[in-house]
Amino acid sequence: MTNIRKTHPLMKIVNNAFIDLPAPSNISSWWNFGSLLGICLILQILTGLFLAMHYTSDTMTAFSSVTHICRDVNYGWIIRYMHANGASMFFICLFIHVGRGLYYGSYTFLETWNIGVILLFTVMATAFVGYVLPWGQMSFWGATVITNLLSAIPYIGTNLVEWIWGGFSVDKATLTRFFAFHFILPFIIAALAMVHLLFLHETGSNNPTGIPSDVDKIPFHPYYTIKDILGALLLILFLMLLVLFVPDLLGDPDNYTPANPLNTPPHIKPEWYFLFAYAILRSIPNKLGGVLALISSILILIFMPLLHTSKQRSMIFRPLSQCLFWILVADLLTLTWIGGQPVEHPFIIIGQLASILYFLIILVLMPITSTIENNLLKW
């Protein structure tokens, strides 16, 4: 008799995706982050569900309801901090996952890559609206500053901002709709992730060499299930280290002050995972220019397949491109640091130089370097 996992309509889907899936035999730990992102998403949905049971999306009670969760709800504090720090772990995994895709040329799977970029935008939108919900000072002013950027859009900008706010400023209507968005978006992310996997399984996984691995495939289970479980345990270890020892390490102290429209914090800044984009936004003196640079800094990923001029897919055998890749990583870390600094000398000029370097590496230096490496192969 045929095994039920191969015949049952539902189990067959699970079987083909996680059990009998042919996987390359040489994929490294950098390939673990897809499954870790899935775990992060499940964790965020579960902790978020329990938080939503006690949270109230009203300007008068939002801040107190979060305090109530931490003080009065059984294990509310751990659920709240797992959710807040879980977002940080989510973005760490996300950035590594995207970096892996850039390094090993995974962007040549066009559909998978494009869905991935849409996923990145959706996760960033979810994190942004989620940060507004505790209704602290940084929540309120972050929401005001970032939504205000839309007013830079010619002609319809001001109307668009007021439409999103549901009034003439960030207020009760804004908070209520942001809570609604924050609740629905993770389920959209889950659906997109399934489409992402669907397209990936059409082509099969890439591998570190960038060479087709059809001649050497192994079943996903038990090899990669065990490997993913190890990754998951390490992820949970790091998350719980954050939650139990330094829960506020990545947060902003200003968010422990209730939102006050009459008092602006000295330095308005988003969560750490948006700082690189925020630094690029601030490095351009013009408002519309800054908004375009901000969007371009992420949207540029869509054009990676067009900018790929190398005859090899992966960077593993291309030392010049490797150097550029790691300079890009260092540049992004520099931008993250600058995004958290006040707007004054020397941070302004460092931010501008780092922003120029970011676009220069991706749009100019990487394609040129790849062409040079192609010519070196002929020698």
From Swiss-Prot:
Anything else known: Heme 1 (or BL or b562) is low-potential and absorbs at about 562 nm, and heme 2 (or BH or b566) is high-potential and absorbs at about 566 nm.
Binding-site positions, heme b b566: H97, H196
Annotated positions binding heme b b562: H83, H182
Gene: MT-CYB
GO MF: metal ion binding; ubiquinol-cytochrome-c reductase activity
Protein name, entry field: Cytochrome b
Cofactor annotation remark: Binds 2 heme b groups non-covalently.
Subunit relationships: The cytochrome bc1 complex contains 11 subunits: 3 respiratory subunits (MT-CYB, CYC1 and UQCRFS1), 2 core proteins (UQCRC1 and UQCRC2) and 6 low-molecular weight proteins (UQCRH/QCR6, UQCRB/QCR7, UQCRQ/QCR8, UQCR10/QCR9, UQCR11/QCR10 and a cleavage product of UQCRFS1). This cytochrome bc1 complex then forms a dimer.
Keywords: Electron transport, Heme, Iron, Membrane, Metal-binding, Mitochondrion, Mitochondrion inner membrane, Respiratory chain, Transmembrane, Transmembrane helix, Transport, Ubiquinone
Record localization: Mitochondrion inner membrane
